[in-house]
UniProtKB/Swiss-Prot annotation:
<dbReference type="GO" id="GO:0019843">
    <property type="term" value="F:rRNA binding"/>
</dbReference>
<dbReference type="Pfam" id="PF00203">
    <property type="entry name" value="Ribosomal_S19"/>
</dbReference>
<dbReference type="GO" id="GO:0003735">
    <property type="term" value="F:structural constituent of ribosome"/>
</dbReference>
<keyword id="KW-0699">rRNA-binding</keyword>
<dbReference type="GO" id="GO:0015935">
    <property type="term" value="C:small ribosomal subunit"/>
</dbReference>
<dbReference type="InterPro" id="IPR005732">
    <property type="entry name" value="Ribosomal_uS19_bac-type"/>
</dbReference>
<dbReference type="GO" id="GO:0000028">
    <property type="term" value="P:ribosomal small subunit assembly"/>
</dbReference>
<protein>
    <recommendedName>
        <fullName>Small ribosomal subunit protein uS19</fullName>
    </recommendedName>
</protein>
<dbReference type="InterPro" id="IPR020934">
    <property type="entry name" value="Ribosomal_uS19_CS"/>
</dbReference>
<keyword id="KW-0694">RNA-binding</keyword>
<comment type="function">
    <text>Protein S19 forms a complex with S13 that binds strongly to the 16S ribosomal RNA.</text>
</comment>
<dbReference type="InterPro" id="IPR002222">
    <property type="entry name" value="Ribosomal_uS19"/>
</dbReference>
<dbReference type="GO" id="GO:0006412">
    <property type="term" value="P:translation"/>
</dbReference>
<keyword id="KW-0687">Ribonucleoprotein</keyword>
<keyword id="KW-0689">Ribosomal protein</keyword>
<comment type="similarity">
    <text>Belongs to the universal ribosomal protein uS19 family.</text>
</comment>
<dbReference type="GO" id="GO:0005737">
    <property type="term" value="C:cytoplasm"/>
</dbReference>
Length: 92
């Protein structure tokens, strides 16, 4: 179910502080976060955010097309290696 529009988008406070500090300083160093649930705001454009996927941090460079999505959408947590296929036995 989608979030109610009257509540507005969600962002963790500590992440917003880090983003604003990086924008003020003009720092291009990646921001490390575990907050996959935070919505991407226009202030994030041009920054690289390392999003944790449960095992490692995935770098996500934020562009205008990312605004409105959640950070977790760009760091997949599951790897699909394919279904087990029929194994061909060698004859001979």
């Amino acid at each position: 179910m989608a979030r109610s529009t009257k509540k507005g988008p969600f962002i963790d406070g500590h992440l917003m502080k880090k983003v604003l500090a990086a924008k003020e300083a003009g720092d291009k160093k990646p921001i490390k976060t575990w907050s996959r649930r935070s919505v991407i705001f226009p202030e994030f454009i041009g920054l690289t955010i390392n999003v944790h996927n449960g095992r490692q941090f995935i770098p996500v460079f934020i562009t205008e097309n990312h605004v409105g999505y959640k950070l977790g959408e760009f760091a997949p947590t599951r790897t699909f290696k394919g279904h087990k296929g029929s194994v061909q036995k060698k004859v001979g």
